[in-house]
């Protein structure tokens, strides 16, 4: 609501560009919430299904949040103050890669939280997972940090010209 009140033009352009990934992110969040509620009311036989629904909803929300970020970094075509792109302009290799990178980020965050809160076998499993995910995340950060200025001359210019450097 704050974005709409402060910057209505930016709000309309951004929302128009990312309707589909934002709606899919919302569906993931809804699925996650419903799964969380129904898991505790389900029979033992059905709990595994609700666990999978929770995982799927969480992964979808995270992935489409990353896809939206990647699409935003790629840029939004605007003409005369209106969104000038198509319904799937947000869907490209960079945005999908960014979505996967955010999945790795949140997985690392979750595994480190479990390291703090658990002990025993789960703690050991999460330590191993966190080490692996840290390396995966570093690869995503490195790739995105290289990809961004190589794909966008304007960003490369801001990053690598004087007085911005140093």
Which residues are covered by each model-predicted region?
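Flexible, glycine/proline-enriched loop segments at strand-loop-helix junctions
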Residues: 47, 53-56, 86-91, 102
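Inter-helical loop and helix-membrane interface segments of multi-pass membrane transporters/permeases
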Residues: 7-14, 73-91
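Alpha-helical transmembrane segments of multi-pass integral membrane proteins
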Residues: 56-71, 94-110, 131-145
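Short aromatic-rich membrane-water interface segments that cap or initiate transmembrane helices
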Residues: 16, 84-100, 161-162
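Early transmembrane hairpin module of multi-pass membrane proteins
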Residues: 2-8, 88-92, 101-102, 112, ...
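Membrane-interface helix-loop-helix modules in multi-pass inner-membrane proteins
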Residues: 2-58, 79, 154-163
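Predominantly late transmembrane helices and immediately cytosolic-facing juxtamembrane segments
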Residues: 40-45, 113-118, 125-152, 166
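Juxtamembrane interface elements at the cytosolic ends of transmembrane helices
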Residues: 30-43, 69-81, 100-122
